[in-house]
């Protein structure tokens, strides 16, 4: 049976000498694995069309088990995004987080909307690092944990102007006057905590212009990745490449 699915490639794995298995996140929010025969042979025309981030109409044969890709009508390859290695790496982190946050039989239209949103934003010049932060914030609960940035985990005070650190002892933000209770709390600027709270709660269709300093973006990334590591034991391959690139840059 011939099937047609509009979607975005979120995973691509080599299979044997010439084939690969891709996973698309379709417009309904379902993960669809597909076998691509002779994908690594340039004569088939599928090599460029079965890479990560490709957005298109995927036509495939489906009987039992995994479908076999026949052709792709490409809508957007996000070519400009690929030209910048940092943008590409952060986009990889976004797709990795979204893919890992979903079980194989999950259906989540929001995840498709989120992925399409961040790829469009990165392609149009918005900060790829910020987009990765947004994805990690929005996917937290799918990994079985959450974090809050708007009140004290100790006193329950909602005076955000006095929040200065994130405590893994108390599982939340704490006030400056409470630092003595956890001397090893992760110190972070009040503005960063405020913006994390805003981004966590703001629907993506309400997000328009962004103007956040690099210093704050770096603080956000460091804390969010630490939260994923501490609460879920997770580390992302995309972040490993970003760290390597930053070491080379400096």
From Swiss-Prot:
Disulfide bridge positions per record: none
GO CC term (a single one): bacterial nucleoid
This protein's name: DNA repair protein RecO
Organism listed in the record: Staphylococcus haemolyticus (strain JCSC1435)
GO BP annotations listed: DNA recombination; double-strand break repair
Domain of life: Bacteria
Pfam family, one: RecO_N
Family under the similarity heading: Belongs to the RecO family.
Function, as annotated: Involved in DNA repair and RecF pathway recombination.
Keywords: DNA damage, DNA recombination, DNA repair
PANTHER family referenced in this protein's UniProt entry, alphabetically: DNA REPAIR PROTEIN RECO (PTHR33991:SF1)
